């Protein structure tokens, strides 16, 4: 199905050559041949430096949704923002229901509209579109770069390199600064063949994620898609694969373009933006995935990660064993005990699920919902436990589905049709019952992301599947069914397009790009608060572990939950009360106790917490130890909540993603690496003393000597800061990005 080459290769005349074979054939050295990739050309066009070893990128456009844009604008405003210097789209597709916290969700939306008017932005009201559906329809085009404050900012299928980052990186662009990274690895994704009937984009995506995530095959790299298989796919199909590349932990993605791309852009009214884009003959890739689309089968990603992927055929053959493993994972990772066995859902050898959802930037495309409607037409979901909801990704998609009768077919079969928002993807809609098993064409199935509360003894399970197999399961009354098991499963066509009508946007969207109205007053609700002040890095630090997490991977959903908690993201202090609440409920009290002692120190009061050290030169703070933190969402609050609670560092064996590490740094925390940290057996209450830490950063050191204090015993340890840049040092020294720009 998928063949992986970890070493570099040349792409020449449709074949791949090793470095040695390329040398024999007279090809340029890899450093020169890399210029033949699509990624190189796009990055070079957006790089403001003379070198390509380090990049300082300016983007063509940006996008944020309603649980990130308030913090971004507040950060930029505190640093001197006067207008948006590039197109900035503010969507309202997360807290769209305004169902939690009284007025606070709609207060954020009102603030967003006032900011779009004041600074010159584009404002998409609630229920009009999911952020990524909107950006595909309105902005993505070959050769562009787009930055979004959502990790699934991926428009590679359009030839756009899009990157999802934490809010501070967007604030930098608003302040006319650059996005600074080392030149990334570029991994070739060579597609051949064509998908079978019943195999959808989520199936291809899950197969790729399952093959790459655990070994970090494409971590922090650009995934570059090309090959004859691209031509067999529609634009919706390509986008469905592309948006899920985030779950591989890659940095970005880009695809070759063709007449299908041109036709789609023309249908969107932007045909003039088309450019032909393909790798040059002899291009060098740092690694390679060869994917034969014809071999991909319907897939299922079991809880609790998209990489926990199996073919539906494999799952059915080993259901009891695999379900018991899910139960074991729930007990180990979530501390859930006494839950009803998942194996109880095996009835006469068939696995019965409780809920189906097709939603968002991955599931809610036109083609996915057409396939679901065709599969369900004339059938009935039935009156038992199983139910299905469908969320079109945008009003233009919804409008065309309605005009063509597909919405009626879905409704007649018993599916619920919801508005265009992201709710079930992050726990703000369709939360399953306790013990229920939901199958979803959405982006993630992390623990509790669907909205369950483990602190209250709740557990529900989410598996990822393609819309085609979800609809097939619905047609079969909730019995898990791969779409390829249907005798009449409709096939996908590469030229399958839809009539784009943006009248809903023209009727409701505020189009203010380049039309700043400085006299406009920002409208603040009572929950919208400024960022708390942070102090510069002290000369020395005494840090106490407020949490120690030994899971193989820690997600941003665990660091700061989504769902109803997201309603408080405009209030940093209030939101911080939820940090790690589902993973370690004692984290916040521990961190606050340490912060209270630090506040005493700053006020000149005596504190025993310093253990005799000079209060004028030694600061107190907390740190989080996790083996591999930061997989998942780009939300800056995963780091900012720690900082608001007095956090000064993360200590890990490795960071799961570049974007989370950037959030840690931009919020003034030290991103420490110790590959053998698991062996240190750090527990909450253990301490790290960092003498001369400020001077070490000022000297440019990439490792610092510290003292680990456990149960009264002290021993020296080395903490590494690999790859830390001069600007990152200065941000940490200043205390955070806001302080750095205020200098």
Language-model features: locations:
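Fe-S-dependent hydro-lyases/dehydratases of central metabolism
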Residues: 1-743
């Amino acid at each position: 199905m998928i063949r992986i080459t970890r070493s570099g290769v040349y792409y020449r005349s449709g074949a791949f050559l090793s470095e040695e074979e390329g040398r024999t054939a007279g090809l340029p050295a890899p450093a020169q041949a890399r210029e033949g990739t699509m990624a190189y050309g796009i990055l070079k066009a957006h790089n403001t430096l003379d070198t390509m070893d380090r990049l300082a990128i300016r983007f063509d456009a940006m996008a944020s949704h309603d649980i990130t844009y308030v913090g971004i604008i507040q950060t930029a405003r505190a640093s001197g923002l006067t207008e948006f210097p590039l197109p900035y789209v503010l969507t309202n597709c997360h807290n769209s229901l305004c169902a939690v916290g009284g007025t606070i969700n709609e207060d954020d939306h009102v603030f967003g509209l006032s900011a779009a008017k004041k600074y010159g932005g584009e404002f998409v009201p609630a229920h009009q579109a999911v952020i990524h559906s909107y950006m595909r329809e309105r902005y993505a085009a070959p050769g562009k770069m787009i930055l979004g404050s959502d990790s699934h900012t991926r428009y590679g299928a359009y030839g756009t390199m899009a990157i999802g980052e934490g809010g501070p990186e967007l604030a930098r662009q608003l302040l006319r600064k650059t996005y600074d990274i080392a030149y990334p690895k570029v991994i070739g994704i060579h597609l051949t063949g064509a998908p079978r009937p019943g195999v959808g984009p989520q199936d291809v995506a899950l197969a790729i994620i399952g093959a790459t995530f655990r070994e970090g095959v494409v971590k922090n790299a650009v995934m570059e898609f090309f090959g004859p298989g691209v031509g067999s796919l529609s634009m919706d199909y390509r986008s469905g694969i592309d948006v899920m590349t985030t779950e591989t932990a890659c940095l970005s993605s880009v695809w070759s373009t063709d007449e299908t791309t041109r036709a789609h852009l023309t249908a969107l009214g932007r045909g003039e933006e088309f450019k032909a884009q393909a790798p040059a003959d002899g291009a060098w890739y740092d690694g390679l995935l060869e994917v034969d689309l014809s071999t991909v089968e319907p897939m299922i990603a079991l809880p609790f990660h998209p990489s926990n992927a199996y073919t539906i055929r494999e799952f059915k053959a080993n259901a009891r064993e695999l379900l018991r493993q899910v139960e074991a994972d729930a007990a180990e990772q979530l501390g859930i005990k006494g839950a009803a066995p998942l194996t109880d859902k095996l009835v006469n050898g068939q696995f019965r699920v409780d809920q189906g959802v097709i939603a968002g930037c991955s599931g809610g495309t036109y083609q996915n919902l057409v396939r679901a409607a065709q599969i369900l037409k004339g059938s009935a979901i039935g009156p038992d436990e199983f139910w299905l909801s469908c969320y079109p990704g945008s009003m233009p998609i919804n409008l065309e589905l309605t005009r063509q009768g597909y919405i009626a077919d879905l409704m007649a079969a018993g599916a619920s049709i919801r508005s265009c928002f992201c709710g079930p993807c992050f726990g703000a809609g369709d939360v399953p019952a306790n013990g229920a098993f939901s199958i979803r064409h959405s982006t993630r199935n992390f623990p509790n992301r669907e909205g369950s509360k483990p602190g209250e003894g709740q557990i529900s399970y989410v598996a990822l599947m393609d819309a085609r197999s979800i609809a097939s399961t619905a047609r079969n009354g909730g019995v898990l069914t791969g779409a390829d098991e249907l005798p009449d499963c409709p096939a996908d066509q590469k030229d399958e397009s839809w009539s784009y009508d943006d009248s809903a946007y023209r009727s409701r969207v505020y189009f203010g790009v380049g039309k700043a109205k400085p006299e406009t007053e920002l409208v603040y609700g009572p929950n919208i608060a400024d960022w708390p002040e942070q102090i510069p890095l002290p000369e020395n630090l005494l840090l106490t572990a407020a949490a120690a997490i030994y899971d193989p991977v820690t997600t941003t959903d665990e660091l700061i939950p989504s769902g109803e908690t997201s309603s408080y993201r405009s209030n940093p202090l209030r939101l911080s009360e939820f940090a790690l609440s589902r993973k370690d409920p004692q984290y916040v009290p521990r961190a606050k106790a340490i912060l209270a002692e630090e506040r005493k120190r700053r006020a000149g009061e005596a504190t025993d917490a310093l253990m005799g050290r000079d209060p004028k030169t030694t600061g107190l703070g907390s740190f989080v130890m996790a083996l591999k933190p930061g997989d998942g969402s780009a939300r800056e609050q995963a780091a900012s909540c720690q900082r608001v609670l007095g956090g000064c560092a993360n200590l890990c064996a490795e960071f799961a993603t570049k974007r989370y590490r950037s959030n840690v740094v931009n919020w003034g925390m030290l991103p420490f690496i110790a590959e053998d940290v698991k062996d240190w057996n750090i527990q909450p209450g253990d301490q790290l003393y960092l003498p001369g830490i400020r001077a070490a950063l000022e000297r440019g050191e990439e490792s610092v000597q510290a003292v680990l204090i456990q149960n009264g015993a002290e021993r020296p340890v080395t903490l590494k800061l690999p790859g830390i840049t001069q600007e990152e040092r200065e941000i940490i020294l200043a205390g955070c990005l806001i302080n750095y720009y205020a200098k």
